[in-house]
Amino acid sequence: MPKNNAIHSIAVIGSGPIKIGQAAEFDYAGTQACLSLKAAGYHVILINSNPATIMTDTATADEVYLEPLTLTSVTKILRAAHPDALLPTLGGQTGLNLAMALDQAGVLNELKIQLLGTSLATINQAEDRAAFKTLMKRLHQPIPASTTVHHVTSALSFAEKIGYPVIVRPAFTLGGSGGGIANNAAELTQTLQRGLTMSPVTECLIEQSIAGFKEIEFEVMRDNQGTKIIVCSMENFDPVGIHTGDSIVYAPVQTLTDTEYQQLRTAALTIVEALDIRGGYNVQLAQDPNSRQYYVIEVNPRVSRSSALASKATGYPIAKIAADIAIGLNLSEIKNPVTQTTYAAFEPALDYVVAKIPRFAFDKFPTADAHLGTQMKATGEVMAIGSTLEEATLKAIASLEIDPKTQASLTPDHHVTTTEYIDQLTHPTDQRLFYLLAALQAGWPLAKLATLTQITPFFLSKLQHIAQLIRNIKQVPTSQHLLSAKKYGVSLATMAHYAQTSVATIAAMTADLPFVYKMVDTCAGEFASVTPYFYSTAFGQTNESHPLGHSILVLGSGPIRIGQGIEFDYTTVHCVKAIQQAGYHAIIVNNNPETVSTDFSTSDKLYFEPLTIERLMPIIALEQPAGVIVQFGGQTAINLAHQLTKLGVTVLGTSVSATDLTEDRQSFADCLRLLKIAQAAGTTVTELSGARQAAHAIGYPLLVRPSFVLGGRAMAIVHNDHELTPVIKSAVAAGHGAPILMDQYLAGTECEVDVLSDGTSCFIPGIMEHIEGAGVHSGDSITVYPPQHLSPAVQDKIVTIATKLAQHLHCVGMMNIQFVVTDDVYVIDVNPRASRTVPYMSKVTHLPLAQLATRLILGQSLATLGLVPGLLTPAPQQIAIKAPVFSFNKLPQSPVVLSPEMKSTGETLGIGPTFTTAWHAAMADSYHLETWQTVDGLITDIATVAQPAVQELFAANHLTVTTIANTTDWPAKTKAVGFTLNDQPDNPVAIAALNHGQPLITAIDTLKTLLAVTPTPATI
């Protein structure tokens, strides 16, 4: 069937800002699909508000609208752009919900826009809980006893009838938002009230709990002729009851019998046929571990998080092929880009095991509820490939970049009591895997662990094998025991920890078992493949990877977490483009399955590996690159630079010694003094007693900052001795013994610059001004370009300071500098690498900053790039505002008040001719607030309204606000803005606003600006 020639232009809806439940996988899918549609000859119109993505680059689509993903905004764009068709299934739940809203508003019909791919009727049937239940009954597919409810009374009645526990699943939500398991009437009432509020159609499914069953996923592809294939089967390590995004997942399925597998496979294909899916589709099923009974859990009629994992696990480009199907092609007509000889109708085959482990942000939110359930809490994930399940699991653990002690020991970092074991194993948190390994090392019977956790004994037996390998080393670290452990993926660090010796000693003792590299080819070696996609294993003798020659190796940034997000994948991809344009082969090492950088077509060769010295050095030894670039991999790559240099590896760009100088707080303070650059009065300490003395000498309030951390980890403002003790303890743990800077807190305007330098001169594309004052992490502050309140003299001084620092450090490539402006211009931080603002500044200046920085790293000068040293003049009549996006609604009891510790998961961009228009556009997708006219007023709490600064602000703006003491005091059916500066976990305003899906403001400067640019709100 030829492609659809009746249409010429296609609008694609992106997924918007990164948040828990909807992350970088949609940048990967959307980029892949847009490029495929362009290659097919269509005019592609992209609508997305996320500046941090490759998807919103001008090269990805013919027209890019960086605009809010609201019905009003998208309707306006569709009227102006006149697309023939709309493809919404690449934008996650956001894209689907917008497509439904556009249809219900009559926009698609009015503008005669054809919907591509899966129909709206199908989307509705899959997403609407009642409609889906009806379909399953018609297909004779078993589903748990359930009912659809719109109020609490009917839910309680149903639960009483079928018995507790029950599962609450809100309709049309993301990542299980608002859902949960209820064990009694009180829990059901609480969970349901939240779920009904968060569902855009005020609907929830109340379902008999099948927690404890095996959870199985199939990624299915179906074309326009009805040809269907299973792209990938996946099995969750954790049983039903834990969101699949928070579960460890293996591919292919590991524990089903052939009969069980075929039964579930048939069910998945039956459902996709009945729904008339056109493209990619994910189905989740539950298998009773004690019988052949299974149940259908749910389906996703779109590209999903699991699609990205399945694509990377198999090498099969799901989003690209889904886009091809959407324009009329069939699987038998689409070539598999991996083999370039077979067609997409062939089901992929795997001769390896893939493990995905989620990455959580509870290190950022120690007060948040870390228990896992049906609502997703992970911010990102890692993937690893191995010859055995043990090897894949241990490689994935090595990729997580968690606490080094836990990563080395594979156990909690403290003595665990029997009571704690039982609690952690029966009420799982993000640490359950490590408690399991500790329990197995301690000799707990496998059967008891299976009973406590409901995890399939097969998986526990694999963990038991790992524990035995470790016990052997602990008892007698012979070469045989070490080699056996290495073969199954036990890291050198873990072996050294238990053998009580150095990593170097272990490396020497295991040198006779080198890693070899195997290809990911989609066909288990059955056909010849050309994919440059490899993984390491200690099993096997044949190396399938051969040196490219004339290459540069680029370190990726690993899993997405707060402080190190998709922005660094953006810079990595652009670095690769510049390397290739310079005539080198580009090699990427990374382990994040969600990203564009780990698409094998991005680089000349991809190694899907942990970002550790143990895994990097054999790759470097094989490839012999001309150098390694670390500037675009965030703190992950920077932290590896020192060790790489010690091992004789050429690290390109700014020297490692200069990097260490800026990362070490004491050395950097000395540098600023030498250059006569203003800095806050302060000193460095390494322990609590010295901190108390320093605090009394400097005076409160103080800013406490550890060295070598990302995202403001363990940074805090301290006002007295009582607050100092826990903050210093946290900073010592986060910095692993490195100096902690304690300096005077400066209350002023914070701003920052990204700098391009060739070592002698520097170019500054723009100065960014923060709305929130110093003391709020730059990643959480609303950022404005060009600055609105900095005088020309201040801007000149910023340029002078940046130039001084770049020259002194001999910075080559990119650098980010943060300032506070009060009576003087003070430097507060320097990062000699790409920062999270690079995509934002690249979009608003129309300069490929990461590519330019890479060219400088490869030896070019600013002059040869045509860049004039100094500050770039901003474009006239354009204001660009970057606003943070938070996922507090997914992390109950987390602190919400903005502070030096970063909390946001993503960002959105608003652009306009004036500050006001740009502000409204940015707020629409970040705080879901366009103007005060759309709300009924302001709600705050007693602790917040008691603060003098708040009282002064309210009086100056003649505000009448509603003050609440309990969450139930929030006015029903009210569109209001919550405002709080109270960081207690039981804060009623934060809880109520998040439960009601209402805007929540947690910094006084944000509210000040909102009041300054919009009319005063009404009174509730």
UniProtKB/Swiss-Prot annotation:
Mn(2+) 3 binds at residue 818. Residues 402-542, 402-544 are annotated as: Oligomerization domain. It comes from the Bacteria. Mg(2+) 1 binds at residues 284, 298. Mg(2+) 2 binds at residues 298, 300. Mg(2+) 3 binds at residue 818. ATP 1 binds at residues 129, 169, 175-176, 208, 210, 215, 241-243, 284, 298. Residues 543-927, 544-927 are annotated as: Carbamoyl phosphate synthetic domain. One of its GO terms (cellular component) is cytoplasm. Keywords: Amino-acid biosynthesis, Arginine biosynthesis, ATP-binding, Ligase, Magnesium, Manganese, Metal-binding, Nucleotide-binding, Pyrimidine biosynthesis, Repeat. Binds 4 Mg(2+) or Mn(2+) ions per subunit. Belongs to the CarB family. This is Carbamoyl phosphate synthase arginine-specific large chain. It comes from Lactiplantibacillus plantarum (strain ATCC BAA-793 / NCIMB 8826 / WCFS1).
